[in-house]
C-alpha cells in the first residue's frame, strides 16, 4: 500500500475522514429514515423499501471496495532508469559490477530533454524521468502519468489506479442518482402522509436529498471533465498547462534515421493538448482504461499489470514495461517535418544510437 509522506499538509488526512463520515451518515439516513421509516412504515411499501435498501447498501459496499483498491494499488512507480548512453561509457566491467545495475541505458527514439539534448533527471529518485512522468511530493517518488492528488480520497491518482478512480466516480454518480430519483419520486406521498399524521417531515430525508443533489453536481461535473480529458489523451496536470493558463514549451530529442542524428525540437504552447492524441477518442480511452472494453465497467484490479525488470536491463522500453509512453503519430510527424524544415534548436550524435539494429 502506498503511503503519503508526513510533509503533506496535516489537514489532507481530515478530508477523507470527513467524506467517510458523510457517506456513513447518508447510508444510515437513507436506509433507516427514508426506506424503513417512511417507505416501509408510513407508506406500507415493504417490497420497495427492501429493494432500495439492498441496492443502496450494495453500491455503498462497492464504493468502499473501489476506494480501498485505489489506495492499495497506488498510482504506480516508475522503475529507476539509468542515464542514457549519450557519451561513450567510461566505466569498465568491474565498476559496473560494483554498481550492481546498468550504468547507462540505450536511448529511445524520442525523449524529453533540455535545449542541449540532455534528458530530464530526477535528483530525488536518481533516475531519468520517462515521458509524462512527474515526481510526487506526497509519495516521494516518480509516478508514471501522474494525474493529481485527490484530497477527497487521500491518495495520488496515476497510471495504475486511474481506471479505478474513474470507476469510483461512475459508481458514486449512480449512487447519488438512485437516492435522488427514489426520494423525489416519493416525496409528495411522504409529505402528504406526514400532514395526515400531523407530524413534520423527517429532516434526515431532506438532508440526504440535498447531499445527493450536491454529489450529482460536483461529481457529475468532475466525471464529465475526466471523460473529456481521456478523449483528448490528457491528464489533469497537462490540462493545467494550457496556453491561456500557464503556457510552456517542452523540448524533445528526436532520432532521425535518415542521417542518424538526433534533433532537439521545441513544442509550441498550443500543442500541449494534442501531442499524446492517438488519433481517435476510442483509441485514447483504450490508452487510459485498457483494451478490454468490458473491464472498463468492472471495478476490479488495474489495467496495468505487475512487472519486474532486471537491474542490468539496458533497454529503455523493457525497463518501463507497461509504463512506456509514446507521442501520438500525428505529432511525431509534425516534429519530423520541423526537422526537415530546419526548425530545430540543435542536433547531436548520441553514442547509444550506434547499437541500434542495422547500424
UniProtKB/Swiss-Prot annotation:
InterPro entries: Palmitoyltrfase_DHHC, PFA4/ZDH16/20/ERF2-like
Membrane protein topology class: Multi-pass membrane protein
GO terms for cellular component: endoplasmic reticulum; Golgi apparatus; membrane
Record PROSITE patterns: DHHC
Main location: membrane
Enzyme class: transferase
DHHC domain span: 120-170
Comment block on domains: The DHHC domain is required for palmitoyltransferase activity.
Protein name: Palmitoyltransferase PFA5
Species of provenance: Eremothecium gossypii (strain ATCC 10895 / CBS 109.51 / FGSC 9923 / NRRL Y-1056)
Gene expressing this chain: PFA5
